[in-house]
């Protein structure tokens, strides 16, 4: 079942505006390694995180074995570095990704701080705005 996302507004590649969904989450379409994915923005997640199923689909191989501390306990996973990630029109060529997200839809990933920290963020109860950081 595909999740509905509200339109994301991209302003001259300077900023994107992500409206809040009815359930209170911020969702944005994107790509990892050129493969389509739906992100749930998770400001508390250290990294972009994907399922093992999606990693196989996106040819995300190798990586360093790691232990993940999640709200549901410890899990094993892999850390991959220097992966291209696009979210809502912003593309970063070198993002750390964790493989090992479990539960839910394998085509939904968490958009964490390994991506978000590269942007200035403004957040209110209706929208999230990501802006290019001033150099």
Question: Language-model segments: what does each one mean?
Answer:
Residues 1-135:
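Pepsin/retropepsin-fold aspartyl endopeptidases
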């Amino acid at each position: 079942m595909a999740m509905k996302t509200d339109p994301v507004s991209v302003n001259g590649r300077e900023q994107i505006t992500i409206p809040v969904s009815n359930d209170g989450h911020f969702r944005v379409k994107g790509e990892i390694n050129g493969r389509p994915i739906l992100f749930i923005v998770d400001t508390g997640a250290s990294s972009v995180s994907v399922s093992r199923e999606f990693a196989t689909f996106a040819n995300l191989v190798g990586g360093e074995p790691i232990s993940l501390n999640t709200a549901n306990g410890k899990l094993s996973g892999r850390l991959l570095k220097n992966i291209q990630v696009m979210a809502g029109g912003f593309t970063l060529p070198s993002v750390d990704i964790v493989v090992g997200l479990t539960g839910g839809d394998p085509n939904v990933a968490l958009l964490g701080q390994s991506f978000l920290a590269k942007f200035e963020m403004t957040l209110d109860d209706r929208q999230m705005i990501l802006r290019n950081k001033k150099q």
